[in-house]
From Swiss-Prot:
It comes from Homo sapiens. The lineage of its organism: Eukaryota, Metazoa, Chordata, Craniata, Vertebrata. Pfam families: APCDDC. Residues 1-24 form the signal peptide. It is found in: Membrane. The chain crosses the membrane at residues 481-501. This is Protein APCDD1-like. The gene is APCDD1L.
Amino acid sequence: MPAAMLPYACVLVLLGAHTAPAAGEAGGSCLRWEPHCQQPLPDRVPSTAILPPRLNGPWISTGCEVRPGPEFLTRAYTFYPSRLFRAHQFYYEDPFCGEPAHSLLVKGKVRLRRASWVTRGATEADYHLHKVGIVFHSRRALVDVTGRLNQTRAGRDCARRLPPARAWLPGALYELRSARAQGDCLEALGLTMHELSLVRVQRRLQPQPRASPRLVEELYLGDIHTDPAERRHYRPTGYQRPLQSALHHVQPCPACGLIARSDVHHPPVLPPPLALPLHLGGWWVSSGCEVRPAVLFLTRLFTFHGHSRSWEGYYHHFSDPACRQPTFTVYAAGRYTRGTPSTRVRGGTELVFEVTRAHVTPMDQVTTAMLNFSEPSSCGGAGAWSMGTERDVTATNGCLPLGIRLPHVEYELFKMEQDPLGQSLLFIGQRPTDGSSPDTPEKRPTSYQAPLVLCHGEAPDFSRPPQHRPSLQKHPSTGGLHIAPFPLLPLVLGLAFLHWL
């Protein structure tokens, strides 16, 4: 979102602001505004990565997923000790996954290789597809897929494997790939299974009211490129929304049982979520350490002031997948327009955001050194940068070394929902995979990032000058400035992406 001004080479993680003791103040009587949802992520959402990842067993979506396009789907994957896998992908006509269109059955073999040198905490894998079949749940879906295939020469060969619309049979399985059916019809449909080439498994404990915490296992697979034309060649460096173990998933989860019991002939029909009208206001935070393509680890905090249509955000970048090693923090602010219903993504609202102010706080030695080596006129003006000290970069029109450019306009997509626990969720448009910015209406997102959670209904006032805002000079997870060993190579690789901004 408005953070697009930040390079996709950097990682922002919102750790939560708190008020530090004033200079000369005695003792520990510091004023804090830090509710539970704004406590440091490692403290409030502890998780453990399983290395090497153990894939065996069934994994399911926990709700309706939105991929760029948009495509609405749910997934149910099963991995076997023999390295074989069976994947069901259920596609829908609607954004609530209540009107099945067609289902894919994908069978193949996957082999874990080595720890990823690009995405920390992930494992690279190879896969081979043995069979791909498709079942159409309506005549309309058959006509739609056939029309897509007929747009290319290779697709027309694949379209011949499908029946004419008048001969549609409910439940019939048509092979798109097998030992008998040669050729890659997945490519003609714009589909790949490259998500299997990047894997991460982690465990966490979900607190339960009046009961022991519940074990939750999550499977993160590689992200899907936001440009369909690039998906065939793209190798993931980020993740999709995670699947969860069918045996160890969050509770309550109305969709989980439906998806776990489904098959290619009986797709799950999900109950619609409680959609909320988009009334921006309050204080929204990341629910976990987020991962973006090009090795970004971050959390976000946004406040929206509905009466003035202004917004503010803190982005904390980290160098590790647990969001414990901070690299730098960005404060950004601006205004947004009144939203209008999206005609392209049902259930979404289109807005335009303007970024007019930004402040930067280097949080490790490498970032501090990089900023001190940059031209003063390109980031913050004259004066040396020091670790943990915030500086205003508005007067220099941003901070070129970090890819921040001001003023900046973005065309956004928002939606709000309520989860089964009654929490309000805010979905913001997915960032372009190539690191560019949605700075034209044509580049407006058609899918969403991980949701933010409503932390407080009234937005705290971040608009006053930095010296009067809650101090970010101490890392909340340690009580003092955390100096993370952040290697120079990832930073250099990251800065290579800046030519896209």
